[in-house]
Amino acid sequence: MMVMKRPSLRQFSWLLGGSLLLGALFWLWLAVQQQEATLAIRPVGQGIGMPDGFSVWHHLDANGIRFKSITPQKDGLLIKFDSTAQGAAAKEVLGRALPHGYIIALLEDDNSPTAWLSRLRDAPHRLG
């Protein structure tokens, strides 16, 4: 007959701590894998009009780049993508397709886990 030993409090705390650590690492991995990207297109000067959303859609579609949305904003367009790779590809395509006079920039999402990690890394920590 086999007698089962009851786990000690120390073993239980190690098990709980390890489970929490694995859960946090899994959450971080998922968050990094699902990184959205936003591309902003703005005219350089006052005399240049905002690019047409349909023409932007046409250039992206012709190059096989999928996007989530195109939104007009005050002085430009915001285009959302599922990944940073799609955003970088769109920046390259639109840089060639649009006439000179536009600033095309990838924006970092302030709520993304990588943005939070970079803030923690770059912020000075004072201990003691």
From Swiss-Prot:
Bridged cysteine pairs (disulfide): none
Entry keyword Membrane: yes
Cytoplasmic side: 1-11
This protein's record includes keyword tRNA-binding: no
Protein name: Modulator protein MzrA
Encoding gene, per UniProt annotation: mzrA
Sorted UniProt keywords: Cell inner membrane, Cell membrane, Membrane, Transmembrane, Transmembrane helix
Function: Modulates the activity of the EnvZ/OmpR two-component regulatory system, probably by directly modulating EnvZ enzymatic activity and increasing stability of phosphorylated OmpR.
Subunit structure comment from the entry: Interacts with EnvZ.
GO molecular-function term, one example from the UniProt record: protein kinase binding
GO terms under cellular component: plasma membrane
Gene3D superfamilies, per the entry: 3.30.70.260
